[in-house]
């Protein structure tokens, strides 16, 4: 979505966490925690009132902080009829990871990943890259610009347009941060 090459996600069991608990680390730092129940479904209740009559464990959805309730699969149709979106534990974790990748994309773009993107772009737009790097900007400065765009939530998928804009305006850029 943002044009970043996502590094592999390593999954390890951690007996220090509660059953069903998970945490996400980025460069060794915890960036998120969550809790899932393998044989239950999460009924997302944006109004905070739709799940009142449903049996289950009240919780907060980990990605966006919405009111929710862990329910049994037999309660799914009641929850959906009440206006809830119902998802399984796998979807909860996948959504959480996808959002964390979006929020931290600028931290995931290292020099190696950026170089891979530039090499791929070079196969189709080599002239722009030749013109830009190193004559107008260093590779490091281009990476800083790409990270800044990602920090702002701007996709770098259309790298050609970004590189062309940098080549056109490199002389006016004083600080690529």
Identify the function of each model-found stretch.
Residues 1-177:
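Membrane-embedded alpha-helical signal segments
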């Amino acid at each position: 979505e943002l044009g970043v090459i996502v590094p592999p996600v390593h999954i390890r069991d951690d007996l220090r966490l509660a059953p069903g608990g998970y945490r996400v680390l980025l460069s060794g730092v915890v960036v998120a925690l969550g809790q899932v129940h393998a044989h239950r479904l999460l009924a997302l209740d944006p109004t905070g009132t739709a799940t009142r009559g449903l049996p289950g464990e009240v919780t907060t959805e980990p990605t966006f902080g919405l009111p929710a309730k862990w329910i049994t699969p037999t309660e799914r149709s009641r929850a959906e009829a009440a206006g809830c979106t119902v998802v399984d534990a796998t979807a909860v974790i996948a959504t959480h990871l996808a959002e964390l990748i979006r929020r931290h994309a600028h931290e995931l773009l290292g020099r190696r990943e950026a170089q891979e993107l530039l090499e791929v772009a070079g196969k189709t737009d080599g002239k722009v890259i030749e013109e830009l790097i190193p004559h107008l900007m260093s590779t490091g400065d281009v990476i800083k610009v790409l990270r800044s765009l990602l920090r702002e939530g701007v996709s770098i998928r259309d790298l050609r347009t970004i590189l062309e804009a940098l080549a056109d305006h490199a002389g006016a850029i004083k600080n690529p941060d």
